[in-house]
From Swiss-Prot:
UniProt cross-references to PANTHER family, sorted A to Z: PROTEIN AMBP
Domain BPTI/Kunitz inhibitor span(s) in chain numbering: 230-280, 286-336
Residues the record marks as site: Inhibitory (P1) (trypsin): R296, A297
Gene from which the chain derives: Ambp
Protein's name according to its UniProt entry: Protein AMBP
Length: 349
C-alpha cells in the first residue's frame, strides 16, 4: 500500500490526459469481516496496475516503496506515511484518510481538483498481503481504477502475485498496464542515491529536458546558495503537479508542507523535513519549546531543553512541530551546545 496519497497523484494525472477510461466498473466488495487494526503497520508496495494511461510514462522509474498505516489524529482518520525513491531522492509523503460507514473503504478528498478518491481493501490475510482498488470519477473522463499489491515483506508467493494480476484484469486493467516493481531497497527521507560521476555527466550531456508543464522539471535557484533561499516565500510554480514538499517558514522557525507543481519555483523547496531543517534552521531554534505535534507517528527524536540546559529525547508525532527537533543526540549537542560536557558552542547562525 503506497497509500491513497500516492494513488491520488497517479489518478489525478488522468485529468489532463485524453484516455479511454473504463466506462463501467463492477461493484467493489471489501474484504469480508475487515479488521482495521490488523491492517495497521508497515507494508511494501510491490505492484501496481491502472486504467490511467499516465502510468506507462513512469513505469520504468517505479520501484518498491514502503507504507506505514496507523491510527489518525481523530477517530475518523487513518494516518499514512509513505517512503519511496523518486528521481534519485528518498521522498516521504504523509496524509490522513477518512473512514466510511463501510469497513475497508476509505476516502481521500483533494479540494484543489474537487475530487474524492474511493479506496477499498479487497483481499488481505493481514499477515502477508493486501490488495487495494482505488477509483476516481471525473466529468471529462469518466471512471478510472488503480490496483495496488502490498506485502508485509518485499517478496510474496507466486500464487499471490497471480491473484493480484487476476484482480486487476477482472476490473478492466490491461495486462501491459500491470507492473511488478523492482526492489531498490529501503531509504531514509532526504537521502540521495549514489551515482558514478561518469554516468551522471553522461546523462546531463545526452538527455533532453522534459517538456514544459510535465511537472518534473528542476527548480530555478539562480545564483543563490540553498541556505540563502530559506528566507524566500515558498513557490508552487506554474506547473500542475501535486508533489508534497517542505519549505522553511522563518516566522514559525519550522519546516512546513506545500504543494509543488513540479517545475520552476525557488530554492526554498525540500523533499523531506529533515533536509529542510538541516539546511535552514538557525541556532534560535534551540530556545523553542519542545513540540510533539498533533499526529501520532511516535518518532524518537532529540530536542534541546533550555530549562535543563541539555538535549533530551522525545516522541515527535510526525507533523506540526518546530525547528527544535534533531535526528540524533550528537546533532543536537553540536548545534545547540551543551555547557560542561565537552562540546563547543555552535557559532552557525
Amino acid at each position: 500500500m503506497q497509500g491513497l496519497r500516492t494513488l491520488f497523484l497517479l489518478l489525478t494525472a488522468c485529468l489532463a490526459s485524453r484516455a479511454d477510461p473504463a466506462s463501467t466498473l463492477p461493484d467493489i466488495q471489501v474484504q469480508e469481516n475487515f479488521s482495521e487494526s490488523r491492517i495497521y503497520g508497515k507494508w511494501y508496495n510491490l505492484a501496481v496496475g491502472s486504467t490511467c494511461p499516465w502510468l506507462s510514462r513512469i513505469k520504468d522509474k517505479m520501484s518498491v516503496s514502503t507504507l506505514v498505516l496507523q491510527e489518525g489524529a481523530t477517530e475518523t482518520e487513518i494516518s499514512m506515511t509513505s517512503t519511496r525513491w523518486r528521481r534519485g531522492v528518498c521522498e516521504e509523503i504523509t496524509g490522513a484518510y477518512q473512514k466510511t460507514d463501510i469497513d475497508g473503504k476509505f476516502l481521500y478528498h483533494k479540494s484543489k481538483w474537487n475530487i474524492t478518491l474511493e479506496s477499498y481493501v479487497v483481499h488481505t490475510n493481514y499477515d502477508e498481503y493486501a490488495i487495494f482498488l482505488t477509483k476516481k470519477s471525473s466529468h471529462h473522463h469518466g471512471l478510472t481504477i488503480t490496483a495496488k499489491l502490498y506485502g508485509r515483506e518485499p517478496q510474496l508467493r507466486d500464487s499471490l502475485l497471480q491473484e493480484f494480476k487476476d484482480v486487476a484484469l477482472n476490473v478492466g486493467i490491461s495486462e501491459n498496464s500491470i507492473i511488478f516493481m523492482p526492489d531498490r531497497g529501503e531509504c531514509v527521507p532526504g537521502d540521495r542515491e549514489v551515482e558514478p560521476t561518469s554516468i551522471a555527466r553522461a546523462r546531463r550531456a545526452v538527455l533532453p529536458q522534459e517538456s514544459e508543464g510535465s511537472g518534473t522539471e528542476p527548480l530555478i535557484t539562480g545564483t543563490l546558495k540553498k541556505e540563502d533561499s530559506c528566507q524566500l516565500n515558498y513557490s508552487e510554480g506554474p506547473c500542475l503537479g501535486m508533489q508534497e514538499r517542505y519549505y522553511y517558514n522563518g516566522a514559525s522557525m519550522a519546516c512546513e508542507t506545500f504543494q509543488y507543481g513540479g517545475c520552476l519555483g525557488n530554492g526554498n523547496n525540500f523533499i523531506s523535513e529533515k533536509d529542510c531543517l538541516q539546511t535552514c534552521r538557525t541556532i534560535a531554534a534551540c530556545n523553542l519549546p519542545i513540540v510533539q505535534g498533533p499526529c501520532r507517528a511516535f518518532i524518537k527524536l532529540w530536542a534541546f531543553d533550555a530549562a535543563q540546559g541539555k538535549c533530551i529525547q522525545f516522541h515527535y508525532g510526525g507533523c506540526k512541530g518546530n525547528g527544535n527537533k534533531f535526528y540524533s543526540e550528537k546533532e543536537c549537542k553540536e548545534y545547540c551546545g551543551v555547557p560542561g560536557d565537552g562540546y563547543e558552542e555552535l557559532i552557525r547562525s
